[in-house]
Amino acid sequence: IFPNHAAQAARDRRTRVWTGDVWKLHRCLREVRPDLFLLPLDTRPTGLLLIAGLDPGNRVLWDRYNPVVKNFRDRDSEVPPDAVIAREGAVDPGSALVTKVLEELRDLKARGPAPREVVGALRALSRGRE
């Protein structure tokens, strides 16, 4: 989700390490699915996005797919903003926060709560980060 330079973010592959326009996914999910917990991780070569709180019954993206894709293609340039290249807001995967989030996910899985409860618990752990 984090291209290292604009060439890696091109829709057509021109580099060995390539992300295409997947860098738009984080912003898209933040806007279209605010019910999810999103934690961008600063991993090499192109980062990861931890997504939690998924509900298999949620049809928001399915129902709005074409308008969402058109919106992000039309309004976002093909060149990622400097903040994306700089990985602003990304968390070191070895940080205590990531460890806590993964432990909480393990514990939550054992209890089987609803997706909104999962998101609430993870957001409480990461206050000030989202």
Language-model segment annotations:
Residues I1-R129:
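S-adenosylmethionine/decaboxylated-SAM
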